[in-house]
Amino acid sequence: NLTEFPRPILRKICVDPFDPSDPCSIMLSLSFSLWRYHSCFVISRKNNHNYFLLGKTYFASDFHLGVDGRLSSAERERQLVRWLETIRHDADAIYLVGDIFDFWFEYKTAVPRGYVRLLGKLAELRDAGVVLHLFTGNHDMWMFDYLQKELDTPIYREPVIHKIGDKTFFIGHGDGLGPGDHGYKLLKKVFANRLCQWLFARLHPNFGIGLANFFSNKSREANHSEDVFLGPDKEWLLQYSTRKSEQMPKVDYFIFGHRHLPINYLLPNCYTRYINLGEWVHFNSYAVFDGQELKLAFFEHPEGKAVEG
């Protein structure tokens, strides 16, 4: 029974790529083919290899490190490290779905200072075999290849579809999706333009990062009522998920961040769920999938509550 193996050995077996020239690898692959029908597994692709994963999959977004909230940014970072430490015993995949930082820009030879505790913990988890998926958000879309190389992890700039166990997940940060918000959609194209990125890189980091933080704070002040559920007719990511579910009926979960409100909502097809991960500035919310069911949960925030529908 493979579930009786020590977990570090299982993780090593599952993370190593399949080698068709290795008889041991072939035997393990056949064993897993029989066993996976009786346990949770994930198949993901990296560098054209198939990986088998065991255990739980975690999703979180919108840490917005660099700005204070219910806790200071430094205290929130330590809290995130505690959360990662508590889930490391059963986490085989972690999706960080955008806006990890309130602002991030990678110069050719410099990155924003700070965040060493979080980055160190993520590196530790990667070295232990935990699969990590990073997404850019609207606050850290200028994340290039630094974290990709240092953490040996993919960075997604658009939504992706991943199969986890026997469930299909549509995952993305959520910015620029759905109806309306044409001003931001235009601005996003400007920010994604290579010429604009080159021009910003010409600014001294002290000035460029300070300017970006100023506009980030202004944007937050203009969206201070984000924690109010607007109803299915006005929640644009819910509307987007509803339309997408009609085009992609095999998707079980649409998972987004960006909205800053934990939401678990059943779509009109009575099968697919729209999940918003909330944020960590106030809610400390995240989602966990155990192979059968996905739930929203709260870390060190017992009064946290999600919008259910």
Predicted regions and their residues:
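Core catalytic region of metal-dependent phosphoesterases/phosphodiesterases
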Residues: 51, 55-56, 60, 65-164
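Active-site environment of divalent metal-dependent phosphoester hydrolases
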Residues: 66-68, 102-105, 134-145, 177-179, ...
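Conserved catalytic motifs of the protein kinase core domain
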Residues: 56, 93, 167, 252, ...
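Conserved beta-sheet core of the metallophosphoesterase superfamily
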Residues: 150, 154-157, 170, 175, ...
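Active-site-proximal loop/helix segment associated with metal-binding centers of metalloenzymes
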Residues: 174-236
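Structural motif
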Residues: 164-165, 289
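Short, low-complexity, charge-dense intrinsically disordered segments
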Residues: 1-9, 14-46
